[in-house]
Amino acid sequence: MAESNQNTDGAVEEGEDENTGDSNLQMELSAFRAKWMSELQPSSGGQRSFSRNAELRRRQETAKEEKARELFLKAVEEEQNGAVYEAIKYYKSAMQLVPDIEFKINYSRTPDPERGGSYLESSENNREIDDLLTYFQHQLTLGNDAMKLCEHETETSQVHISALPFEVLMYIFRWVVSCDLDLRALEQLSLVCRGFYICARDPEIWRSACLRVWGRSCTKMLPYSSWREMFLERPRVRFDGVYISKTSYIRQGEESLDGFYRAWHQVEYYRYLRFFPDGQVMMLTTPEDPLVTVPRLRSKNSRMDSIMFGHYRLSQDTDNQTKVYVVVSKRKEEKVSEYQRSRFCRRNPVPEAERSFHVGLQLSSGGRQRFNKLVWIHHSCHITYRSTGETVVTAFDVDKMYTPLFFARVKSYTAFSERPL
């Protein structure tokens, strides 16, 4: 009995030793696996530190770029105010921080909260106003018994323009547009205040401008939604400048005496077309530079002998292309007596024929401007003989020598107003 108990105790001790050995083996194996995994991933901690450093550098770059942006915008503001030296200092500081800040900057101005930049309700700050005219009219009439188009910002002892009646103010606006149809000045005037914006959108002004351009062919504004849209979208010639084309070619000169040398000449000349709202047109072909010629085309009373005067009309054919037809001729001389004061001097004989030139042009748009290109489609000379009344027509081939005319706006043409619209 005692021997059996001893055998049982020995078996239990051997089982406990085996369990202890297995647990130690498992612990050693787990430690080995952990060490092995740490050896396989030695840079995991380094990657975390690298990502933190990259994030820190990115924040520093963003802060530096924001600082450079503020300095650059400050330099722009100082330059606009005339403080050139201060502007140079800010420009230099901005360029030292970010050399290419000029190309990264966004010039759109954010509204200033101190000056009422949030003129819309908070729920409408990011929503585009569909009908700005209706909105401004509502703002002016809201809470005002007597609507005023504008109010003076500072106190003044003189009479402010807001004291003028609406009819007088509209008459001033017609003077701004003038008989030259300077609608560009009207658009600039509408930027002054909300009241001027409303006056500049008056349909009668735009209707009068459309009637000056298209006459009886625009009695209805369909398919356009307004007279202003018709004036801006419908093809027309422009009056606030001149259409210019440049043609150049090379021709042979005369041979030298020894026959070994022949000169070559590069010939350049310009064509100018100036349109007026009353249907008149001036045409000039000359080798003179536009810097010299353009000021002479400001008035219809120009004294240049080479200028041809005439009239034009707009035509929209079935192919939906707008064409301009021009008829020009030399201005007739004033009638003088047959004999001058000196009996030995006769005046120049009356020409036996009259010459006129007929031009056909196709109106199109090129680049970012509208209606700024005229392409030649026809050019002919009509000679009418006084003795017989016969007219001879000579048509010219429209080839590459007839380069398109492009519009150039001339500020001096609309600098003064002679008559209201």
From Swiss-Prot:
Quick one: which pathway? Protein modification; protein ubiquitination
Q: Does the keyword Nuclease apply?
A: no
SUPFAM superfamilies of this UniProt entry?
Answer: F-box domain (SSF81383), MIT domain (SSF116846)
In what ranges is there compositional bias, type Acidic residues? 11-20
InterPro entries registered for this protein in UniProt: F-box-like_dom_sf, F-box_dom, Hrt3/FBXO9_C, MIT_dom_sf
Q: What does this protein do?
A: Substrate recognition component of a SCF (SKP1-CUL1-F-box protein) E3 ubiquitin-protein ligase complex which mediates the ubiquitination and subsequent proteasomal degradation of target proteins and acts as a regulator of mTOR signaling.
Q: What is this protein called?
A: F-box only protein 9
Identify the species of origin. Danio rerio (Zebrafish)
